[in-house]
Amino acid sequence: MQDDLQYAQEAASEPGLRSYYKEKVLQQEEGHMKRVEILNQRIVFDDVFKIEEATLRFERFNGQMSEPVRRLVFERGDAAAALLLNRDTQKVILIEQFRYPTYKKGPGWLLEVVAGMVDQGEQPEETIRREVREEVGYQVSDLQPIATFYVSPGGSSERIALYYAEVGEADRVAAGGGSAAEHEDIEQVELSLPELWTALRKGNIVDAKTLIAVQWLQCRLAGQQNVKGT
């Protein structure tokens, strides 16, 4: 939390960002949130996921309401993910698995951080603890929040809660490999930091949540180096 506060303070020290955040905070405190009018909405597809169609008007930046517009939302649910560091080997734990939506454009098999969908009534922390056990066989004790973000806000409501955690061989409680009921076939991949940076530089990591996690780790380690150097 202290790191997050420091980051926010540093970001807000930039003149442009400072005025932007100040305006947004004042709007929230005064209840001046922009208006949205939902004229009608309906579910047009309902299988594993849902697609919602809505007609709405929204407040434009000039204060006027827009004309009625049609929007589609892919309702996939929210997810949780975690970047794991093996404290015994000082290697980052990733997974590799087949992802059919990426098969046509490639590569099909992706390097990713551990992740899973948040079940109804479940908190993201519960989700990621379960997924870490299922996919790589570790029991996680401490979770450090990195960020919560929208995956593709132009068409999907899905958010991912991303965490960082350290594990060791003493935390291994299962074989991992994924859920047989979900027909998962997951291979655990451990990369040293130089190997991870090389994979990033060569474009071998193409999953967005994993890119965010790895770049966060780079910033975190760079910050630690700067502190040591002062």
Q: Where are these predicted regions, by residue range?
A:
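NUDIX/MutT-family hydrolases
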Residues: 178-204
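Conserved hydrophobic/aromatic beta-strand scaffold that supports enzyme active sites
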Residues: 51-53, 83, 94, 162-164, ...
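Acidic pyrophosphate-coordinating catalytic loop
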Residues: 43-47, 63, 103-104, 150-161
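A short coil-to-beta-strand element that immediately follows conserved catalytic motifs
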Residues: 37, 139-146
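Active-site-adjacent beta-strand/loop module that shapes the phosphate/pyrophosphate-binding cleft
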Residues: 56-61, 152-174
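Acidic, metal-coordinating catalytic segment for phosphate/diphosphate chemistry
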Residues: 44-89
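Alpha-helical and coiled-coil interaction segments, frequently adjacent to or embedded
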Residues: 7, 12-34, 45-47
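Conserved Nudix-box catalytic region and its N-terminal flanking loop in Nudix hydrolases
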Residues: 18-20, 71-74, 91-130, 172, ...
